Amino acid sequence: MPFELTVRYSIPLTPLTDVDEVLREFLSQIGYLSEGADPEATDGSVAYRLMRDCLLRHPDRLWYPEELTAVLKTSKPTVYRHLNRLKALDLLEEVSEAQEGGKGRKGFRLRYGNLGRAWDFVEANAQNALKRYRETVDHLGRLLEDERKPTVPPSSSKGKPSS
């Protein structure tokens, strides 16, 4: 799954003291929650409750999709849609457990069981992505520079006056 993060310039949310307000704004800034949504609607959304009530409240716990479906009172596809968005941010780790009969069971938890450490992973991915963009921009600049260089026509002895 490709790494995806919305990056926009914003001021730190450190003046805010309400954890739900900070979390709502932060999750909107990084592209996990819809921007500009009504706070009451957001707090009741599956996406928000998955983060707030499950992953952040119990960061070390391994959550199974069936459990999340029951806790969040929603469908399995909805749970997976939000899990996949968090996986794209690289905030989640996926753990497979072998069960009897050979079929594995997947569980999910906040990476490293800690939001700060999980965010370190996100930052590293973002830095790598920006570095690759820089390499592409530099390469594109060189190609454009080469394209602008005047081309010298091949020298020819025809048409020159003889001495």
Predicted regions and their residues:
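Short, locally clustered residues in the helix-turn-helix/winged-helix DNA-binding domain
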Residues: 51-59
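Amphipathic alpha-helical dimerization/coiled-coil segments
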Residues: 116-163
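A short, conserved structural fragment
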Residues: 87-99
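Short, cationic-aromatic polyanion-contact patches
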Residues: 43-47, 97-124
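Alpha-helix N-cap/helix-initiation sites
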Residues: 39-44, 61-62, 76
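N-terminal leader segment of winged-helix/HTH proteins
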Residues: 1-41
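Short acidic, hydrophobic short linear motifs in intrinsically disordered regions
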Residues: 59-70
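Short amphipathic alpha-helical interaction segments
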Residues: 73-88
